[in-house]
């Protein structure tokens, strides 16, 4: 695979940059900047909306260019500038402006780097491009296993300024290997080439309507983020567990997610991506139902094994699925996939908070199960095949 090592290093450093600072952004806004809960909500909402708008625009622009690298480097440079600014700015409006103007652009680094990698792998034979992207997604997940712990250690010793300076350094280093990667030459037309094993299922016309697919992934994103936000509160407040137990369960899920992703790469024969995604959504329904029923650690451990399998499918293959549905538009496809998670996250905070306020923490997971079931139904409807006469 061309430039695989350089791209792997860039993805690892990008993952470290986002995972070092991301988990502590709300804490920084409240403790260091002095934002009120309303200001924090506005800050996070404006950031998310700006990120969706900017990344969508950049994704469309990138697909019209023969060389995507300048845009990739632009998003990484925005990350450097954003975290350099946050290491010194302590005014509410200054931090908000940094978020809307710089963090929004840096959020496009994830889809742009992966689109750049996918376009570079485009001429590899068979299903190697899809498998290579899955490996890179596993590397990004590994960075999120390591990054928050490193960020917490840096925060304890050098405060928020140290965390943000380290994140800026990771953004800068992520761009270095990309400087030495030449843009891929246009792929020659191969009308008689056979489809790869990962794309065989998508060969049957018509292609699923993107509106239904996007809606399904957005509902999945809502369920995923709602479950993630409320899980620690459910364990500690409802089941009277400890923060150490929460850390163990979350860490177990993150660790198991990576080998499951790599299993997709190493397996010789796989069901179609479409089938795996629908199966993953059904498995998510079971995952949330079991959390709702859980009374202690044994069942909670089982739920995290299921969650790891679901996240491996949806994160590892979801991006590939969008790229298959939008052939030749790698930036737009990857950006659209990424934006479903951003929008789902934005909606999840409001809905989860209101639901927990009225019904308590445990029923939140029934709502997550319902959202996952609705997402599965949408995917089932979107991918239905016309019956032959």
Curated annotation (Swiss-Prot):
Q: How does it sit in the membrane?
A: Multi-pass membrane protein
**Which InterPro entries does this chain map to?**
MFS, MFS_dom, MFS_trans_sf
Q: Which CDD domains match?
A: MFS_Set
Q: Which family does it belong to?
A: Belongs to the major facilitator superfamily. Set transporter family.
Keywords, comma-separated and alphabetical:
Cell membrane, Membrane, Sugar transport, Transmembrane, Transmembrane helix, Transport
Name any Gene Ontology BP term.
transmembrane transport
A GO molecular-function descriptor:
transmembrane transporter activity
Under the heading Gene3D superfamilies, the entry gives: MFS general substrate transporter like domains
PROSITE patterns (alphabetical): MFS (PS50850)
Functional description taken from the UniProt entry: Involved in the efflux of sugars. The physiological role may be the detoxification of non-metabolizable sugar analogs.
Q: What is this protein called?
A: Putative sugar efflux transporter DR_1322
Query: What sections of the protein cross the membrane?
Result: 10-30, 34-54, 69-89, 96-116, 135-155, 161-181, 211-231, 246-266, 281-301, 308-328, 341-361, 363-383
What does the UniProt entry say about where the protein is found?
Answer: Cell membrane
Q: Name one GO cellular component term.
A: plasma membrane
